[in-house]
UniProtKB/Swiss-Prot annotation:
Keyword Hydrolase: yes
Name of the protein: Ribonuclease Y
Annotated source species: Mycoplasma mycoides subsp. mycoides SC (strain CCUG 32753 / NCTC 10114 / PG1)
Domain of life, source organism: Bacteria
Membrane topology: Single-pass membrane protein
Recorded GO MF terms: RNA binding; RNA endonuclease activity
Disulfide bridge positions per record: none
Primary enzyme class: hydrolase
Main subcellular location: membrane
Gene3D superfamilies linked to this entry: Hypothetical protein af1432, K Homology domain, type 1
Record-annotated KH domain positions: 199-259
Biological process, per Gene Ontology: mRNA catabolic process
């Protein structure tokens, strides 16, 4: 019995659970159906509202477009009316002008008819008068015409010749005056310093006691200056003064700076002299470059190779007929620029050509060839303008001048060289003689350096110990004596010294 009740309860619970699930499912379905319906109704409502909004916006845009169209149409109509009115006015003006032209044309036609009648009458009168003149003179019309032309021609030729002669004289006088004015104006604008070339530098001493130290034991220090520096050290009775003498201004400047530095340092001995000479040589190279840079800055020259700048600076230590070449080149540059300015030519190019016209003199004592040829080679090497190159080649008439600037540079060069006090031939001849001696010595095989001292009366030949032996010294000496006799004239006795010295240096650690 209990079992049956339990079974019935179990069945009843199962049926109840199944019914509950079914009812829950139906309820859930109905709820979802209502939710969907509400969503559909909401979406439908929103769609209707959007449709109304779109239609409203469309009507508004159509209305605005219609209004805009009407306004444009009205404006265009007004513009057309205005144009039409202007055309009508112009048409009326044209009609009036046409009437005026027609009236004038009629008057002109009448005037032409009147003129033709008058011309006909004048022609008749002219024929009548010509006939009377022919009868009176016994000449026909053509004969009288030829006679008149001949007389007028002779008179005109005489007058023309007179006019041409006067014009030629006036042009010659005027051109000469203009040329003089241009050159005078250019020279007035240039400030020139008058300088004379020296072959000695004076070194001031704080005390005469230093003279003995400068000479050194057995004159070793002075010999070091002569052999290594290529200069003469002159120690005389002049108080507190030592003279550095050399025709080569670069060597003289290096030796002067070396001696001044050694005096400050206090240690004066051959090794110190040699080291200081090398140091001052390097410093002088820097000074040469700075001189070149300051020169191109002074003349406002741009875009120039640094090696060419160094050569310009080197001209400071080169002379020609006693005239400093750098000062001469700057003077020629300024004169060329001033003349070019007066003539309306390229001033910058004229200044550049004037500065570089003697650039070959920076190396003519080191290489074979004239300064003109060497200068042109330098200009070509550093890509200078062809006009500049021609100025260098033609300033001594070696080549034909190809531009006005070339002629200007040649004129400026002549003015600079010919002014009073600019050049002194004696010292230049002396320098040429000394240079020739050194060239002869350096051309002998085995000779490393040659120094001409004491106006050429003392010649030092420094032999390369790796090339020439002690046995070769006599041969080198004889060769030098023979060359000097044949090529150089020096009055008095000449002492030639051949020096072969070899040093071995090592560092012990």
């Amino acid at each position: 019995m209990n079992d049956d009740i339990i079974i019935l309860l179990s069945v009843f619970c199962g049926i109840f659970f199944i019914c509950f699930i079914i009812c829950s499912s139906i309820a859930l379905y109905l709820w979802k159906s209502k939710s969907r319906k509400r969503l559909v109704e909401q979406y439908t409502k929103e769609a209707k509202q959007a449709k109304k909004q779109i239609l409203a916006n469309g009507y508004k845009e159509i209305s605005e477009a219609k209004m805009l169209f009407l306004k444009r149409s009205e404006l265009e109509k007004n513009e057309l009316d205005r144009v039409k009115e202007q055309l009508e006015l112009r048409s009326n003006d044209l009609k009036r002008n046409q009437e005026i032209v027609e009236s004038k044309s009629q008057r002109l036609d009448a005037s032409l008819l009147d003129l033709e009648k008058r011309k006909f009458l004048l022609d008749k009168k002219e024929e009548y008068l010509i006939k009377i003149l022919e009868d009176a003179s016994g000449l026909t019309k053509s004969q009288a015409k030829e006679l008149l032309i001949k007389q007028v021609k002779n008179k005109s030729e005489k007058e023309l010749i007179s006019i041409l002669k006067n014009a030629e004289l006036q042009a010659h006088s005027s051109s000469k005056m203009i040329a003089n004015n241009i050159i005078i104006s250019a020279m007035e604008r240039i400030k020139v310093e008058l300088t004379s070339q020296r072959t000695t530098n004076i070194v001031k001493l704080p005390s005469d006691d230093l003279k003995g130290r400068i000479i050194g034991k057995d004159g070793r220090n002075m010999k070091a200056f002569e052999q290594i520096g290529g200069v003469d050290i002159v120690v005389d009775e002049t108080p507190n003064t030592v003279v550095v003498s050399s025709f080569n201004p670069i060597r003289r400047e290096i030796a002067t700076r070396t001696l001044e530095q050694l005096i400050i340092d206090g240690r004066i001995q051959p090794i110190k002299i040699e080291n200081e000479l090398k140091k001052q040589e390097q410093e002088l190279e820097y000074i040469i470059q700075e001189t070149g840079l300051s020169t191109i800055k002074e003349l406002n020259i741009n875009d120039i190779d640094i090696e060419l700048v160094k050569l310009i600076g080197k001209l400071k230590f080169r002379t020609s007929y006693g005239q400093n070449v750098l000062a001469h080149s700057i003077e020629v540059a300024k004169l060329s620029g001033a003349i070019a300015s007066e003539l309306g030519l390229d001033v910058e190019k004229a200044i550049r050509a004037g500065l570089l016209h003697d650039i070959g003199k920076a190396i003519d004592f080191e290489k074979q060839g004239s300064h003109v040829v060497l200068g042109a080679e330098i200009a070509k090497k550093y890509n200078e303008d062809p006009i500049i190159i021609n100025c260098i080649e033609s300033h001594h008439e070696d080549k034909e001048k190809e531009s006005e600037i070339a002629a200007i540079v040649a004129i400026a060069d002549s003015i600079s060289a010919s002014r009073p006090g600019a050049r002194y031939n004696a010292i230049d001849e002396f320098i040429l003689r000394m240079t020739e001696i050194e060239k002869i010595g350096n051309s002998i095989p085995g000779v490393a350096k040659t120094y001409a001292l004491q106006s050429g009366r003392q010649i030092r030949l420094i032999v390369n110990p790796l090339v020439a032996s002690d046995l070769d010294l006599a041969m080198i000496l004889e060769k030098m004596k023979e060359e000097i006799k044949n090529k150089v004239i020096i009055p008095g006795e000449i002492t030639i010294t051949v020096i072969r010295e070899r040093k071995e240096t090592d560092v012990l650690k």
